[in-house]
Amino acid sequence: MHFSKIIAGSALSSVALAEFQNGTVTTHVTATGYTTYCPYPTTITLTICEEENICTKRPIVVSEPTTVTVTEPCIISTSYETTEVVVTTTLPSSLSPSSVAPANVTSFEGAGSKNVASALVGVVAIAAAMM
């Protein structure tokens, strides 16, 4: 049991330390069934497994738009492209901090009396609505 933990840990660390490269990655997924829709005539080649360790490639010919369903376990290959992401750590000169001072903000004194008057008008309106 400890051996498998050590192997798994070393495998993960070697993947983490590996140098990144662009390219195509192909993964294989074992599915218990497969359904797809083919809008055009085509040939699908699936690896279908009759038993756990006996798998064979089998072509499925599609002559018209239809849904293809495979109920046996099969291996599905998926490929995708990997690309390296370039991270820019410096700002362009057009986005440098501004050297202009912020504008002065002044406050208006004496506005409290206007707020009190508005509150009184609201109370009177509510009282009138209740009558």
From Swiss-Prot:
Residues 111-131 form a propeptide. This is Predicted GPI-anchored protein 26. The keyword Cell membrane applies. It comes from Candida albicans (strain SC5314 / ATCC MYA-2876). Disruption phenotype: Leads to hyperfilamentation, increased biofilm formation and reduced virulence in a mouse model of disseminated candidiasis. Also leads to increased susceptibility to antifungals (fluconazol, posaconazol or amphotericin B) that target the plasma membrane and to altered sensitivities to environmental (heat, osmotic and oxidative) stresses. GPI-anchored protein involved in proper cell wall integrity. Does not seem to be directly involved in the synthesis of the cell wall. Required for normal virulence in a mouse model of disseminated candidiasis. One of its GO terms (cellular component) is plasma membrane. Induction: Induced during cell wall regeneration. Expression is also increased under high-iron conditions. Repressed by the HAP43 transcription factor. Its main location: membrane. It is found in: Cell membrane. It is a lipid-anchor; GPI-anchor.
